[in-house]
UniProtKB/Swiss-Prot annotation:
Intracellular or extracellular location(s): Virion
Disulfide bridge positions per record: none
Function description: Structural component of the virion that presumably stabilizes the groups of hexons but is dispensable for assembly.
CC per GO annotation: virion component
InterPro entries: Pectin_lyas_fold, Pectin_lyase_fold/virulence
Keyword Lipoprotein: no
Assembly with partners or alone: Homotrimer. Interacts with hexon protein; this interaction tethers the hexons together.
SUPFAM superfamilies xrefs: Pectin lyase-like
Name listed for the protein in its UniProt record: Hexon-interlacing protein LH3
Protein source organism: Snake adenovirus serotype 1
Family membership noted in the UniProt record: Belongs to the atadenoviridae LH3 protein family.
Top-level taxonomic group: Viruses
Signal peptide: none
Amino acid sequence: MTSVEDLYVVKPINQWPAPSAFLYPLPRGTLLPGQSPDEAFARNSVVFLVPGAEYNWKNVVIRKPVWIYGERCHGEDFRPRAIIHIMGDLDNPMDVRIQDLTFIGGDSPDRLVPFSAVLTNQMALWCIDPRITIRGCSFYNFGGAAIYLERSERDTGFRFGRGQVMITDCRFRGCRIGIANGGSVEYGLASQNNFSDCQICFNVVGGNWTRSGNVASNCRCMYLHTQGMWYEGAAGNFNPAHGSFTSNTLNHCDYGGNLWPTEFQLPDRVINLAGFYFDNAAARLPNFSGNSQWYGDMKLINFLPDSTFVINGGALYGGPGDTGVIAVATALAAKVFVIGCQGNAGQQIVNVPAANIIPEVGTRKDDATQPAA
């Protein structure tokens, strides 16, 4: 079925030929439930998992290039550690591809327990110095970040783009955090992913990511960046944020539209989340264009003072009370523009000058007490 030499494909890699069938003879590289995943990943360049099977994995370590095709199988672990730990090489990134796996972190989300250092270990995938493609996977009920991408050291030379992380067509449900990228994990792509009932979708540290075409419904926060974050990793909060955040949907990502608390415990303080939350005077915001905010609030507390921020070409819809408020710190409000957006009167825009909202949309007001960190 396949022929792979040093990960250079000389014949097309076909997935399991009949997703509902258990075939004999099995495709080369098939990993059966109960067999050692460490041995299979070390021995094969392409590994097939059995359609519909369940695999109970605990801290499986990958140290070489491998492509894993899940065919809707389930990887499950109720212990506080990553299910798969990928240990790459910063200077010579290795290609790892994970496709069509379902990862289950627990029976249900534990929304009322404050986040802590212990919970950060409850992950599906912990990837150090990765060059990884994750496609078509599902992640359910993880107490920490379902996917954590980390750099082993700060990148200051020409290695920024070597990781080339791509996360596409995945589902996240009931997770504390969906995707966390640490410092110096840059130039990644997260596209066409669907988040539901998560507290935070993107825990953003490393910069220059493109996040496009993602949907967050009934999540408390789609985009979080501040200082002193969880999952900063060995590289710290270096060269953070910016990049692009375009054509995404924030649906009921506000204080009343989901089951997660607004309060979020960071290592040194508690913050009050928003659908889009940014608080770092040393960082630039991402390009923000074409996003749909249907009852999705926004807090812009701090950003680099010599920069501006434009909410461009979006759909801004709010409701009664404070549902779906866009609030900007007074000191920075003149640097924020709302250009070419549609919306309704229920959308409140706080502290942005009227001259910066073209055409007029929503209901503008001034309030020096907003946004509250």
